[in-house]
Amino acid sequence: MDKSKLLDQCGALGEDRTLLARVLDRAKQASERNIPAATDFLSPAQQAQAADLLHAAGIPETAYIRWGGYDGAERAVLLFLPDWMDPSDAGTYSPIRCLRAAFRKEENLTHRDFLGSLMGMGIVREKIGDILVGPDSADVLVLDTVAEFLAQSWESAGRVKLRVAEIDPGCVHIPEIRREERRDTVSSLRLDAVCSTGFRMARGKAAALIESGRVQLNWREGTKPDRTVSEGDTVSARGFGKFELTEVGALTKKGRIPITVQCYK
C-alpha cells in the first residue's frame, strides 16, 4: 500500500497527516539506507497514531524504539533501527540532548514559562521533549538540531534570567510524580463508568465528555461510552488530567467490580 493510502486508512488529516508522513519517511530511510533514523518528538497521542500507522504498513515493533531521553519520558522520538543495530545500543545514536536551565529558587518558574520562552524563540514544539521543572532548575530535552543554538542563545524565561548549560541526558533530575489513589466499585468496566471514578463526575457527565471527543483511551480518541477499559489502561481528558486503571478486583456479592485508579496531578 502506498503512503497516501496508508495515511487515508488511518484517517490522518492536516498537521497529523504531515507528521505521520514524516514517520513513514524515517522508517523508509532506515530500511533503504540501513542507517538509524529518528523522528521529531511525538506526544503520547501522536506515538499511538504512529504505532497504528506503522502496524498498517507492516513495520514490526522490533524495527524501532520509543525514546525520550530517560526512562518514563512522556514525549519521545521513534528511532528506527537498521539491521545491524542492537536495540541496546540505540542510545548511542539518539538525537536527544539535554539542557539545564538554572534560575533563582524564589522565581517559582513553571513548565509553561519554559515552553513559552522556547517557542517565543521560534523553536517549534516537535523539537522539544519533556520539560522537567525542579525548585531551582529545569532539565529540558531537545533535539540535537537546536541544542547548540539554545545553549548559546537562551538567556531568559519571561523576565527571569537563566543560566543554561548542556548536561548528559543520564543526569536529568526527574521530579517525583504526584499521584492520588482512588478506590471505588463500578457496575461495569465501561469507559463512562471508569471515567466517573477517575474524574470524579456523574456517569452521565462522563458519557457526554466521551461523546464530545475530549477523552482518550491509551492516547486514542474514544467517543463511545461503552468501550471496555482494561487493567493497565490510561485514560486522559482535555481539561481533566489523566489516570491509570491499576487494579480490577473480583466481582462482589452485589455484582459490582472493585477498581483502583491512580490519578496524576
Describe the role of every protein-language-model region.
Residues 216, 227-230:
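Short secondary-structure transition/capping segments
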Residues 1-198, 221, 228, 241-265:
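Ferredoxin-like alpha/beta domains used as RNA- or RNAP-binding modules
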Residues 217-219, 238:
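Short strand-turn-strand beta-turns centered on an Asx-Gly dipeptide
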Residues 209-210, 229:
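Short, well-ordered loop/turn sites that connect or cap secondary structure elements
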